[in-house]
Amino acid sequence: MNIKAQIAAHLAGQAEPKRGEMREVHRRVLRASPGCRLWHSDGKDEKGKTVSNPTIGYGLQTIVYADGKAKEFFRIGLSANATGISVYVLGIKDKKLLAKKFGKRIGGASVTGYCIRFRTLKDIDVDVLEEAIRFGFAEGASEPEKNRTAVKKKAKAGGAKRKK
């Protein structure tokens, strides 16, 4: 099954009203970054053990670890959880910035360094959520290509290092 089909099945598998709300957030993420790379994780590790909630991912960033290994990962994530919905805004260097910029304006959501968690869309200002998503894409929009290139060059030269 391709990624779009996996995402459609994942969304269809949610009970209402969460299904409709997840579809609305999905639509807004795609509107914020049309044509972005899509990801889907079923939340299971290689052994089939559940390690996280299933997540839809959007966009691309390259994470470079301290040991020099690099991994491609999504910039924005969408996940249903037992109490509501989580939107992950990854790759922002300042871990206080997301909460500072959107925490008070978004309404009834918990905003941490990289996660916006809410019970229902009725509790939040959805336009501010979309603004936060756009911010997440823009904050490191040029980083994936720069990072990937830097990792390749450093790997050829004997290993990439994590920036401090």
Residue ranges and their predicted role:
Residues 1-164:
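Charge-dense, helix-prone N-terminal extensions
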